[in-house]
Amino acid sequence: MQKPYDGRTMSTHRLFVALRPPRPIRTRLIAAMHGISGARWQDDDQLHLTLRFIGEVDRHRAEDVAAALGALHAPTIAARIAGVSLFERHGRPHMVWAGVEPAEPVAALHRKVDQLLMRVGIDKETRAFLPHVTLARLNRGSGPVAPFLALNGDLATPDFVFGHVTLYESELGHGGSRYHPIARYPLDGPVAATSAAATALTSAQVSAKPSSAP
């Protein structure tokens, strides 16, 4: 049964829905994360594939979101890391990321999540969806990106499986954002389907907040 929020004192909750690569894949990504001076590299706690950024909502809407995602039914996804690239902002490199393939199964899951969120009043996603894992955030003081892209252009991992979806709360701080898992939603297995009802994390688990700063 979906548990309510744990009662943190925040009046609003900054939420997003994501897939978390398994530890061996995260380790491989971290090993490649170097070579751009001034980059804000992600740490292990921050590596994820965002399915849907929700943004700031009040407590009641947050509880509605957590409950709505309990209706998610979707298959597990076999995926792999395939190459690196970047996003630009105002003509400057803004973010370095690793691609995830095949894209369509992840995009299909993104659409299902979006449909469930619309049922509880979250606006439909209008931005194009590109499955990726953010590796670093850049600013005007960051060094050249081209050497990193050239070195890691063929970055690849063995196939792995996304077995569940997680609802996260993002807490902004002076050192950057910290991501707290709120509820986990298993995806259906490839043979015997498992229940997609949410398994909310206990208050104790949530209170053991990871130390992370993007």
Where are these regions (language model features)?
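Histidine-dependent nucleotide/RNA phosphoesterase domain, centered on the 2H-phosphoesterase fold
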Residues: Q2-A204, P214
